[in-house]
């Protein structure tokens, strides 16, 4: 009986330790994301694991023949030269 209780206590302690260590990792990750400015690491900071900017997508069902026909439908949020369009059953553009 005592051996079983000791085993259970040991397993419970390991579970608590594993859970607490995973919380520490999550806190470090949040700190890293807070340090990002505009999706980039600020000056002097390295490896801040910035999240990529959200991709803007524009779908248009107007007929097209080539990908080049679709560039006029680039989302307004795209910076010059960052828009990629394709023609599949209508235009789909993203940046």
Curated annotation (Swiss-Prot):
Q: Which UniProt keywords apply?
A: Antimicrobial, Disulfide bond, Fungicide, Plant defense, Secreted, Signal
Record-annotated disulphide pairs:
48-95, 64-83, 70-91, 74-93
Q: Which GO terms describe its biological process?
A: defense response to fungus; killing of cells of another organism
Q: What is its main location?
A: secreted
Signal peptide feature range: 1-26
Record's subcellular location: Secreted
Provide the family line.
Belongs to the DEFL family.
This protein's name: Putative defensin-like protein 262
């Amino acid at each position: 009986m005592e051996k079983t209780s000791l085993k259970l206590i040991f397993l419970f302690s390991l579970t608590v330790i594993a859970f607490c260590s995973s919380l520490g990792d999550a806190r470090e990750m949040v700190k890293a994301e807070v340090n990002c400015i505009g999706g980039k690491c600020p000056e002097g900071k390295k490896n801040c694991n910035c999240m990529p900017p959200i991709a803007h997508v524009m779908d248009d069902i107007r007929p097209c023949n080539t990908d080049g026909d679709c560039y006029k439908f680039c989302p307004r949020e795209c910076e010059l030269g960052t828009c990629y369009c394709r023609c599949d059953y209508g235009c789909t553009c993203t940046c």
